[in-house]
Amino acid sequence: MKLHEYQGKEILRQFGVNVQDGKVARTPDEVRQIAREYGQPVVVKAQVHVGGRGKAGGVKFSPTEDKAFENGEKILGMDIKGLTVNKVLVTKAVDIDAGTEYYVGMIVDRNVQSFTLMASAEGGMEIEEVAAATPEKIIKHRVDPVTGLRPYEAREVAIRAGFKGNLNKIADMMVKMSEAALKRDAVLVEINPLFVGPDGVPLALDTKFEIDDNAMYRHQDLADWRELEAEHPLEIEASKYGFAYVKLDGNVGVLGNGAGIVMTSLDVVNRAGAKPANFLDIGGGAKAEVVYNAVKLVSKDSDVKAIFINIFGGITRADEVAKGVIQALKDGILTKPVRMRIAGTAEDEAKALLAEVNSPLIQMYPTMFEAADEAAKEANAAEAK
């Protein structure tokens, strides 16, 4: 379950993390009232479960209460990547130029089967951009879920990342953040930026917090926080089909069988010069109907300009995959180019079925690299028109 910024901050506050003051507003008048209470410049921030709020105009500095009201009018009701803004967080403004911005986060790292603490001096930026351009600037440290993050480990990470200020207090914040992640069964916690002012004291200005859906039965006190209307409609629809689906910001729809192969597919799409629009795992042993529904789901995404299907058939039969894709084409659901790599069980039967259809929309390639390259070309060409 994804949490709003203000909810993530509330959890971190419960664990002793120093977070930026803020209150939630649902009307422009409430925005004005909060700004008046604070008696200083504020920032009005859209509360939606997607990234890129600032670039979309959903985060605005407001030097006066009248400007806060005006910005509240602009942001409330705004559409950001398909989600309507129904509430905003009004926070006290901070003079960013007077200090330094850092990044700290905790993720579930399946490669090492544990949590990984991440820290970077490149705060205030999307961490994915930092990872792509300068991965050496992200310091990673495995966290034992039994013992948790120890203070000396946190200080060591802060030093390696090049953090300045009161390192003991920064390390203490990292320890408390990791404690929140572990005790709340989080799959992701980020503080970005973590602001360190002239006094050296760290302050969490923005947060991301996502709790493992499979662990929500242990956190019934947070059940009321889930807002289906605040989640992406495609993610809600995917949950009805039982798909493991995550909406991303790219232009190539990605579909595969198994989390590992789908993660690899995302990397291959990036390598090909495009960006994945989603993560979609159809699971093992998927029949034609499952594939049909998966293609239907991805095709509904207006961001998707081409679809990359990457299947290695074991218990998933390649001919069942082909049947599902072909049926979607026949029903008029599939209107975007599909570039496929299918190997394994019933591979020859799948090739025969697709050859019989002989549609330019559906093309097979011998390797996933070739299929991803072609999908990327199709998607980028469509966007360039």
Curated annotation (Swiss-Prot):
Which family does the record assign? Belongs to the succinate/malate CoA ligase beta subunit family.
Q: Which cofactor does it need?
A: Mg(2+)
Chain positions recorded as substrate binding sites:
257, 314-316
Q: Which GO terms describe its molecular function?
A: ATP binding; magnesium ion binding; succinate-CoA ligase (ADP-forming) activity; succinate-CoA ligase (GDP-forming) activity
* Assembly notes: Heterotetramer of two alpha and two beta subunits.
The record lists the lineage as: Bacteria, Thermotogati, Deinococcota, Deinococci, Deinococcales
Kindly list the GO CC terms recorded for this protein. cytosol; succinate-CoA ligase complex
Q: Which cysteines are joined by disulfide bonds?
A: none
Matching entries from Pfam families are given as: ATP-grasp_2, Ligase_CoA
- InterPro entries the record matches: ATP-grasp, ATP-grasp_succ-CoA_synth-type, ATP_grasp_subdomain_1, Succ-CoA_synthase_bsu_CS, SUCC_ACL_C, Succ_CoA_ligase-like_bsu, Succinyl-CoA_synth-like
| Catalytic reaction(s) noted | succinate + ATP + CoA = succinyl-CoA + ADP + phosphate; GTP + succinate + CoA = succinyl-CoA + GDP + phosphate
* Keyword tags: ATP-binding, Ligase, Magnesium, Metal-binding, Nucleotide-binding, Tricarboxylic acid cycle
Q: Classify the source by domain of life.
A: Bacteria
Q: Tell me the Gene Ontology biological-process terms attached to this UniProt entry.
A: succinyl-CoA metabolic process; tricarboxylic acid cycle
What's this protein's name? Succinate--CoA ligase [ADP-forming] subunit beta
Stored SUPFAM superfamilies? Glutathione synthetase ATP-binding domain-like, Succinyl-CoA synthetase domains
The UniProt function text for this chain reads:
Succinyl-CoA synthetase functions in the citric acid cycle (TCA), coupling the hydrolysis of succinyl-CoA to the synthesis of either ATP or GTP and thus represents the only step of substrate-level phosphorylation in the TCA. The beta subunit provides nucleotide specificity of the enzyme and binds the substrate succinate, while the binding sites for coenzyme A and phosphate are found in the alpha subunit.
User: What Enzyme Commission number does this protein have?
Assistant: 6.2.1.5
Name of the encoding gene: sucC
| Keyword Amino-acid biosynthesis carried by entry | no
Q: For Mg(2+), which residues are the binding ones?
A: 192, 206
* Ligand binding (ATP): 45, 52-54, 94, 101
Q: How cofactor binds (record note)? A: Binds 1 Mg(2+) ion per subunit.
Q: Specify the ATP-grasp domain's residue ranges.
A: 9-237
Pathway assigned to this chain's UniProt record: Carbohydrate metabolism; tricarboxylic acid cycle; succinate from succinyl-CoA (ligase route): step 1/1
